[in-house]
């Protein structure tokens, strides 16, 4: 998701997105640990998406 799309969302929507991404990250980590994860790049993508959401939340908190 692009940063511009994230900035258009409300804080509640961003928190929901963050919870969703955290759950997805957990599932991917478990798949990687058991050797079932074929597309390992997904871990990096989810980690970066979490960072983007947290950054936008911090920006909104400063406003």
From Swiss-Prot:
Q: Name one GO cellular component term.
A: cytosolic large ribosomal subunit
Q: Which InterPro entries match?
A: Ribosomal_protein_uL29 (IPR050063), Ribosomal_uL29 (IPR001854), Ribosomal_uL29_CS (IPR018254), Ribosomal_uL29_sf (IPR036049)
Keyword Zinc-finger among record annotations? no
Q: What is the name listed in the Swiss-Prot or TrEMBL entry for this protein?
A: Large ribosomal subunit protein uL29
Which biological process annotations from GO are given for this protein? Answer: translation
What top-level branch of life does the organism fall under? Answer: Bacteria
Checking Pfam families in the record gives:
Ribosomal_L29 (PF00831)
Q: Which NCBIfam families match?
A: L29
User: Which key words are in the record?
Assistant: Ribonucleoprotein, Ribosomal protein
* S-S pairs: none
The gene it comes from is rpmC
Please list the GO terms describing molecular function: structural constituent of ribosome
Q: Does the keyword Flavoprotein apply?
A: no
Q: Which family does it belong to?
A: Belongs to the universal ribosomal protein uL29 family.
């Amino acid at each position: 998701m692009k940063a511009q799309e994230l900035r258009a969302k409300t804080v509640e929507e961003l928190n929901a997105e963050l919870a969703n991404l955290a759950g997805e990250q957990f599932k991917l980590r478990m798949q990687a640990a058991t050797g079932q994860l074929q597309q390992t790049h997904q871990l990096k993508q989810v980690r970066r998406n979490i960072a983007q959401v947290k950054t936008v939340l911090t920006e909104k908190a400063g406003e």
